[in-house]
Amino acid sequence: MTVDISRATADELRSIAERGAVELDGASAQELLQWTEDTFGDGASAATGDRNGYIVASNMQDGVLVHLAAQVHPGVDVLFLDTGYHFPETIGTRDAVEQVYGVNVINARALASVAEQDVAEGKDLFARDPNRCCALRKVAPLKQTLSGYSAWVTGIRRVEAPTRANAPLISFDEAFGLVKINPIAPWSDEEMQNYIDTNSILVNPLVDEGYPSIGCAPCTSKPAPGSDPRSGRWAGASKTECGLHAS
């Protein structure tokens, strides 16, 4: 039976993810993105209120995933969580990626500005309760944006942190209720760098300044040499993930 992706139920999307995970076990990033396009690319009509097809998430550390996706779907939707706390270099990278790769950047923002949050929650919530800050400025806007799509593509990789060591290529994201594709999950740091060099990929200038994992400015520091690349995120706290990749 053919499933109307734009109106697919959670159970139907879960079944699609399960079949895809089996059929594309060991597939390349390009093959995974082509499957994503073939399965979800037609999307739906926004005028009907149905779900769109899929969106590609990027933290704008580099343009690798966006470059890969744009070759399969020129003008693809790219999700950027504009928390209000980003480094200027990250915002600059976002703008350059949109222009150079010709994609449609969707800026997901919290309902409250940083100033409004300071009034409601107290100044510098990130320092007192980083989990709540991430919930308000990342998780909630992400959930709202993803509710309009049937699938999302992320750039998480297994080598980035122990919490991501078993990241699947395709799964059903129970937290957000849609299919999740991680096409570069198996890539090593060397493979990433080779793709960047070979294709002259845009890279956030902060990477060359010693930031291998870039998030919000107040919660990002340079990790010690040889340590977990994500150890510079929320340094000094037990927190290691912002809640976007819990499933």
UniProtKB/Swiss-Prot annotation:
Pfam families: PAPS_reduct
Family note: Belongs to the PAPS reductase family. CysH subfamily.
Pathway: Sulfur metabolism; hydrogen sulfide biosynthesis; sulfite from sulfate
Enzyme Commission number, as recorded: 1.8.4.10
Designated name of the protein: Adenosine 5'-phosphosulfate reductase
Keyword presence, Cell division: no
Cofactor needs: [4Fe-4S] cluster
Region (Disordered): 222-247
Binding sites annotated in the UniProt record for [4Fe-4S] cluster: C133, C134, C216, C219
Gene Ontology terms: cellular component: cytoplasm
Gene it is expressed from: cysH
GO biological process, one term: hydrogen sulfide biosynthetic process
